[in-house]
Amino acid sequence: MEMLQGLLLWLLLSVGGVWASRGPLRPLCRPINATLAAENEACPVCITFTTSICAGYCPSMVRVLPAALPPAPQPVCTYHELRFASIRLPGCPPGVDPMVSFPVALSCRCGPCRLSSSDCGGPRAQPLACDRPPLPGLLFL
């Protein structure tokens, strides 16, 4: 009976290992399509548009035992290569720049967060929203 239990345990662990090695349970860092919002205080509408952003899982390590060392920096999914695109906000009064520029992810990588080009916060309870009335249905990549 003990040998049967050992064999069953070995079988379960080996099958579980094969299943787990097929790939990560979380999607890795990569470009994905996302809908964002653009507005200007001087313009009457908000535009939602679709672009490519970096999102996904980056492997990280956390110390299990307390140490006198500072915490290890945690990598984030951030831009590797990008280009900038622009959209024009309709209905802006004369003298107000109606153009809004935004990054388009071409490729992504796991690395330190650069506040100059990335939002390093965690997931949001609500997606980015507009204060002005929306003008939906535009698609830009």
From Swiss-Prot:
The cross-references to InterPro entries, in alphabetical order and at most eight, read:
Cystine-knot_cytokine, Glyco_hormone_CN, Gonadotropin_bsu, Gonadotropin_bsu_CS
Offer a single GO CC term for the protein. extracellular space
* Keyword match Signal: yes
**Localization of this protein:** Secreted
**Which terms does the UniProt entry file under GO BP?**
G protein-coupled receptor signaling pathway
Gene3D superfamilies per UniProt? Cystine-knot cytokines
Name the Gene Ontology molecular function terms of this record: hormone activity
Q: Enumerate the glycosylated residues.
A: 33
Disulphide linkage map: 29-77, 43-92, 46-130, 54-108, 58-110, 113-120
* Entry keyword set: Disulfide bond, Glycoprotein, Hormone, Secreted, Signal
Query: Which superkingdom heads the taxonomic lineage of this protein's source?
Result: Eukaryota
Q: How does it associate, per the subunit comment?
A: Heterodimer of a common alpha chain and a unique beta chain which confers biological specificity to thyrotropin, lutropin, follitropin and gonadotropin.
Described by its record, this protein's role is as follows: Promotes spermatogenesis and ovulation by stimulating the testes and ovaries to synthesize steroids.
**What name goes with this protein?**
Lutropin subunit beta
The organism of origin for this protein? Ceratotherium simum
